[in-house]
């Protein structure tokens, strides 16, 4: 006969031994949750970003005729033809000039945002909306409006110039010397709204105590702007510099809407993306067009990397 206490002991013993071998869960372990959340995003990036880049690199090493067919591997012949062409140098120069002019809108946006955020100013929200509204409009539609403004005969700009004594104002969008400058002014104007919103948010994050301390020390309003506002606003300025530079290298829609293809100024205003469009879809040389796309990608990567390396000298992260 088995004693009841013995049965109880035999029942408890395995539980105690089993619990002794149980592994304690690491409180810092998160398991597979990061992979579950990041995995779909990384898969989408690989499919929609990295794979097209790889396919474009492969296409740039091949020669395809206008009617398709079997592409022929030509190695770096497309790149040799591209770098020997004066069209590439002209397109790079036009793209850089446009980008530099549009970048001038950032200090202008800093001034506008600083005026909007002045203490005691009423209707700040209304001013932000008014500056941001052009950014919400369709770029092609706004470009058509500016095309009318730039019209050489009855455009608003030339009417104003004639009223102040300029007897022979230029035909802005037809003259090769003025067309790119006119498009760049449109790009500068179009960037103001987005810039002001970003900079206004940055200005609102600056503690007011810093201005009060600077005022007690006798700093003027201009010195406060230079020594307090600009350094603490530098992360927002750096972000806008990156975004504006990338947008400048992607110039196409404004040129296409305002200059067109039959304009005598078109060859002098052709950007890198315009050159890509012309080679790939007008001349039907997809291999050369792919080579232009790779050059654009490389230039944007180099310029962006240089900006990130240089930002350590002037960007202040508090």
Residue map of PLM features:
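A structural signal for multi-pass alpha-helical bundles of membrane permease subunits
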Residues: 30-318
């Amino acid at each position: 006969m088995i004693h009841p206490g013995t049965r109880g002991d035999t029942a408890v013993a395995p539980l105690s031994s089993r619990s002794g071998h149980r592994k304690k869960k690491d409180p810092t372990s998160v398991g597979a949750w990061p992979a579950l959340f990041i995995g779909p995003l990384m898969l989408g990036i690989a499919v929609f970003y990295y794979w097209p880049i790889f396919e474009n690199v492969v296409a740039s090493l091949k020669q395809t005729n206008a009617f398709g067919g079997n592409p022929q591997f030509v190695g770096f012949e497309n790149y040799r033809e591209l770098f020997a062409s004066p069209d590439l140098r002209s397109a790079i120069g036009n793209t850089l000039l446009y980008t530099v002019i549009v970048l001038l809108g950032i200090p202008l946006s800093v001034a506008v945002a600083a005026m909007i955020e002045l203490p005691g100013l009423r209707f700040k929200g209304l001013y932000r909306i008014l500056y941001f509204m052009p950014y919400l409009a369709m770029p092609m539609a706004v470009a058509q409006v500016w095309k009318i403004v730039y019209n050489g005969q009855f455009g608003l700009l030339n009417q104003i110039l004639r009223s102040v004594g300029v007897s022979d104002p230029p035909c802005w969008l037809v003259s090769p010397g003025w067309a790119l400058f006119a498009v760049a002014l449109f790009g500068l104007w179009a960037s103001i709204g987005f810039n002001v919103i970003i900079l206004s948010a940055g200005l609102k994050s600056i503690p007011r105590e810093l201005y009060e301390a600077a005022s007690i020390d006798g700093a003027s309003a201009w010195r406060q702007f230079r020594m307090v506002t600009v350094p603490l606003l530098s992360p927002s300025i750096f972000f806008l510099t990156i975004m504006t530079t990338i947008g400048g290298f992607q110039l196409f829609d404004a040129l296409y809407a305002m200059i067109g293809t039959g304009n005598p100024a078109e060859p002098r205003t052709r950007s890198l993306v315009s050159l890509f469009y012309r080679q790939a879809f007008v001349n039907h040389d997809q291999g050369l067009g792919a080579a232009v796309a790779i050059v654009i990608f490389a230039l944007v990567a180099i310029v962006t990397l240089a900006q990130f390396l240089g930002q350590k000298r002037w960007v202040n992260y508090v």
